[in-house]
Structures are given as structure tokens and as C-alpha cells.
Amino acid sequence: MLTLDKIYHAAFVLKDVARKTDLIEAPRLSKDCQLYLKTENLQVTGSFKVRGAYYKISQLSKEERDKGVIACSAGNHAQGVALAATRRGIKSIVCMPDGAPIMKVENTKNLGAEVCLVPGTYDDAHDKAVELQEETGMTFIHPYDDEQVIAGQGTIGLEILDQLPDVDAVIVPVGGGGLISGVAFAIKSLKPDVKVYGVQAEGAPSMYRSLHEHKYQTLNAVSTFADGIQVKTPGELTYKLCEEYVDDIVTVTEDETAAAILSLMENQKLVAEGAGAVPVAAALFHKLPIEGKKVVCLVSGGNIDVNILNRVITRGLVMSGRKANLTIALEDKPGQLQQVADIVSRCGSNVVSVLHDGSDPNMPISSCFLKLTLETRDNAQIEQIRQELTKAGFQLVAERV
């Protein structure tokens, strides 16, 4: 049974292992509330996961330690298990979905774990880990549906209350539910009036649906670039804890998450992965009743693959009106490109790339598509460019994407 004493004990065990990460105010991220960031993206291994993994492994018997540990993870729990096991001289095997970010896979190997890549999602990796556990007799370290893991994650709740005693609400990312279960239990046990909200990706709303439909359930499929919360099945223990201690769970879109990552980079100089950014996305896009409140967004991790980050930045720029892609139908005659360029210039925008495409079979031979990528200030400037091009007689075939 989870108790506050167990969370305090976890905090004692972790005091020389996990950092007490900073809680920083972020006034540029929200004008509607007093927003703070709990920077677990700056934690050891770049994620909160080391807390639960280390505490769980620290409580194993000698017999269990001698046999070793096995885990499944999209990346962050893998690194936490690898670090904890290596520090305590224990063999570790981690099953990871083959689509896990390369950086997380390599970091897990570098921390001393044997990595087994499994085709499919986190849930497929979980099934493989259970199979290997039965074959080897190693102890399975569940990433979220485990009382000691939850207690380890709950230490973040203790730290938030210590760092901001008059906090009104805490927003937490949700995958399987281990993090929010621990944080909510700790906070509600000490200050029941503090609101605890969860956020899931719109494409992976397993806990959201379970709580809103009052029925524990597994999704047929999930899809989100926020790999840390890409979970089909929430934990059974975490579901019960969320039912009792979590005030509400909302979802955010991929575009909203991308915009939050970009905003954290530009305004706070912080790199967050998709899962770590969803609480900020919920605040930025007004998903929760937090106006005028002191609010903590738990930035759970910063382990984002650089290739994904590049695409996320591009999407975030488009979402914020800082980048636009326009496709214009032109008559293939001299002066058309110059006229378009002049209009864009007069509106104060910069052309990043130009593609003159006459190969579309649906276009007349005498016509072509002009595809532009523009650097813009905001959505208002994009609309101004559209209007000026239309006024000049140009046909916009496709606008921002």
C-alpha cells in the first residue's frame, strides 16, 4: 500500500542520487497565470524516471539483485534502470520499441544495460520483457505500475511543496500514470486543496479515456511523437490512484506540443521532449481553469532526438505564424516570379526557398506551381501576404501547412 512515509523514505534514499531540480518562474510563457517550471529535464539521465527506478532497485533483496533486473521502456525508464543497476553492480536488460529515439537507445547502452530492440510500440516491448523475465528469473522493474516506482516519482511532489508552498495547481504529463500517481498522492496527502491535473497526447489518451469513461481500458493503437507517453494501457494501480487523487486529465494535439517545445526553447532556454512539454502546452492553449493561479508545469524530461527536434521546431514555427508555406498557380511567363517576390518583400517577409514546378499533370502546359517557404512575424503578416497576392490576381492553391 502506498503511503506518505514510503515517499519520504524514497526521498531519503534518493538524496545522493537524484537532483532536487530547480523550480523556475516562467512569466513569458503565460500572461493568464503565475507559471513555474519543475525542471526534471535537467535531472540525472535527463528525466524524472531515475527516481522511481533507483528507489525500486534499492529495495531488492540480495537474491533478486544477484539474478539481475529487466525492464521495458521507450527510453527514459530504460536509462533510469540502467543507471541504478550499474551503480549497484546489478545486471540489467532493457526491452525498447525499435522506434525509440536513437539517443535514448545509445544512452541506455552507455549506462551499462543490455538493450533488446522490439518491433512495435512500448506495449510490444513490455510483452517481450515479461517473456524474458519468465525465462531468466530476473526481477521485472515496471516503468509505472509499481508501488515503489510510484513512491520514487512522488518525491517530486514533496519538492514542489517545499519550493512553492502556496502553489494552487500542478500540471503533470501522463503516459501509464506512475508520475502523476506519485505526485498527486504526495501533494493531496499534504495539501488536499492543491489541484493536480494530467495531460496526455491526443493520439495516446489511454488514461484520459479510462478516467472520463469511468472504465479501465486499453487502446487499439496510439500515435504521438511524444514517445515517453505513448502508452496503450495505463497501469491498474495508477488508474485507481488517478481516480482518487487527480482532479482532471486533458489532451493536447501534436501541433500544440510542438509549439510548447519551441516556446520553452525560445523563452526559457530549456530543451524538453514531447512528453515533458505537454503540461506547458495545456497551459499555453488554455486547456485548464488556471487563470490567476500559481501553477507548476512538470517538465518531465529533455531527451529528444535531434532529428525529431528539427521537425518539431519547424512545426512550432508554423503554428506560431513564424513560417509559412504557400503554393501559387502562375502563368509560365517572364516577370511573374519577380512580381510575387516584390509583394512578399513589401509585406516585410523573407523568402527562404523557392520551387518552380511545371511537372504537375493537372496544370495546363502554359502554367506552373510556385512553392514558397517564407519567414514571417506572425499569422497577421501571413494573412496580409495572402490578401496582397490575391489582390494582384494570383491564385493561392495551398496555404500554410
Model-assigned labels for residue ranges:
Residues M1-V401:
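PLP-dependent amino-acid enzyme catalytic core
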